[in-house]
Amino acid sequence: MKRLYFLPAACLLLALPLSAQENLKNENLRTLSADSILTGDARMDSLYRHLPEVMVVGERPVVKASAGKLEYDLPRMIEGRPVDNVYEALKELPGVVEQDGALTLGMQAVTVVLDGKVTNMSGAQLYALLKSLPADRIERVEVMYNAPARYQVRGAMINVRLRHRIGDPGVVQGEVYGKYNQEHEASFEERASLLYNGRKFSADFLYAHSHGESFNTTDKEARHWQQADGSTHLINNYEEMRARSHTHSLRLGTDYTLAENHSLSFVYNGAYATSHTRQNSTGTQTAESVSGQTSWLHNGRLDYRTPIGLKAGAEFTWYNAPGDQLLHSRMGDDALDFYTEDGQRINAWKFFLAQEHQLKNGWGLNYGAVYTTSVDHSYQTYENEELKKNEESGLPADVRSRRREQTLNLYAGFSKSFGRKLMTDFSLAVERYKTPVWDEWDVYPVLNLTYLPADGHILQLNFSSDKSYPDYWAVQDVISYLGGGYSEIHGNPLLKPAIDYSTSLTYILKSKYVFRAWFNHTKDRAVQTLYQSPDELLELYKYLNFDFEQQAGLQASIPFKAGRWLDSRLTLIGLWMRQKDSDFYDLPFDLHRLLGIAVLNNTFTLSRKPDIRLTVDGRLQGRAIQGIYDIPTCGGLSATLRYTFLGGNAVLTAWCRDILQTSMPCPQIRYARQWVTNEYSSFRSVGLSFAWKFGGYKEKKREAVDTSRFK
């Protein structure tokens, strides 16, 4: 297994979503939808981890406000949009944007949960599951900029409520799906799902298989200063990377209703994946690298709900990912020849108890406890080809570790409705976080106020605090090689969790125009950065804790339409961002930047019978920063054609993304004696997908065996 914690190498900035809103009778309804930033290669990851999100508002979909959350009718919002799975559907929500292959909401990292159940799975594993779930499974979505403690989540949360029952008892429904995407290389996906609804028992089954090849390039130019003799070395490297992969995903969910508000449910998620990568470098350095990785995931969760408001549950996760790499590299008089194996095995358990009370006069009370524990078994070994073992080879020392992590969370909160116009929700959580390095107690308050002054007008004020923990592999004391060996990826066992404080004010005017202001302050923000070593010709990629990061922003989203043939929205954002680190090697910095973002999304109805729609989305973003990195202006343009037929049960979709091949920025460093430019490849992609929903039929009734005369 090769874990790459370094500055990413590819990014697709695609503006996808378009949605709408509508005021229905006496309900306060509104929509929003979001732009998306897609990353194509792991090495571009950290560049987009902290870029601003884009909240986009449409005109047709509906949303209702309640205490601390917005309830969206997402199935209506994605009608006519090129959305085939739950992950893509969530990007239609207001303020949701994809950065580094992960979803963010309102300038914050966001936790996505299914049916209110927080999982032990990592973000990447959860997103893989969401991408395999058909969008048709969504019943509704709850969005919270600051989730109350009773949800066992801190910070922003998206709760996806799945459909578990369809029609009358005995009904079975399913979907088959196929996808072909041609970028530089081709990739494919096949998926099948079934949903069964009984009188007391319901079940869902899903299998998905994604596979294909990928290709990308990196053109690096560097001026590397050496302290010993004051010389500057010119580095020009060109890298090509080809990879192929297979991923199999499986989900089985069951629900059994014992009585009203009395139920038992179990969900299993499994995955098996393989990948093989070959990388070649030419120029100042010549290198060839071959690597592979295999991973297994097993996750099971049991939930029990009682009529008195008591909930209890347990979850287990097992993950294993061994990998290897063979590298031959030459740079001047230096040579690297080695074979390395690494791996990670994680066992994680979670147990919880939660109690909720609905009291008189609009009061609600909730409290509970959550305990999680995990053990991370990781290793990394190096073998020199000539010595056949890691002796006097100059390679990193072998590492084998067993790291245990424990978290205990105790919380209590209340909610109160003051008539129909004012709602409040407050909670307080106390948490202990214990690892071999840290043993800390923290307090997390959350406050949400919602005010509905009139029909179509919504005002929501939020304040929260949050803590985000580093990835397991990021805190291992390991060293990996990247780009033929000129770049090294270092783990950081002393990496701290980051603490975030955020507040936001959202105002929706006439259920149509959305205005939002926000401010975030993150202490000990963990960011992976590049640093040119002054002692040797070596680039270091390592996660470090900045002193803090601050972001403040304003946003206006304006939907408009022309007749029945065009739905559009324009989103404008102004953002101020600041990052400070007083102990960044020998180069302390305190940098800030003002930038703007403009997004225009259009859906053209070419025909209603047959149902044919064209979407054209464009985005332009100004210069941003990440530490001493300067991220230049970038943009993206995409188009999608969607044909729905067979009574809405069949959908054929074709697309062209990154039409102008301008979505990939070329980040650079020009700070003190640090001088680097990375040019990453950007390829236009075209694709075709087909989805067919079937069923809605009842289970056949078969004649029972006559046992009336048996004993």
What residues fall within each predicted segment?
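Extracytoplasmic beta-strand/coil segments of soluble accessory domains associated
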Residues: 87-122
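Short acidic/polar hinge/loop motifs at secondary-structure boundaries
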Residues: 119-146
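Transmembrane beta-strands of outer-membrane beta-barrel pores
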Residues: 178-182, 198, 209-213, 270-274, ...
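Face-selective signature of the C-terminal outer-membrane beta-barrel domain
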Residues: 201, 247-273, 290-445, 450-458, ...
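Outer-membrane beta-barrel signature, preferentially recognizing the C-terminal barrel domain
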Residues: 467-516, 521, 541-553, 561, ...
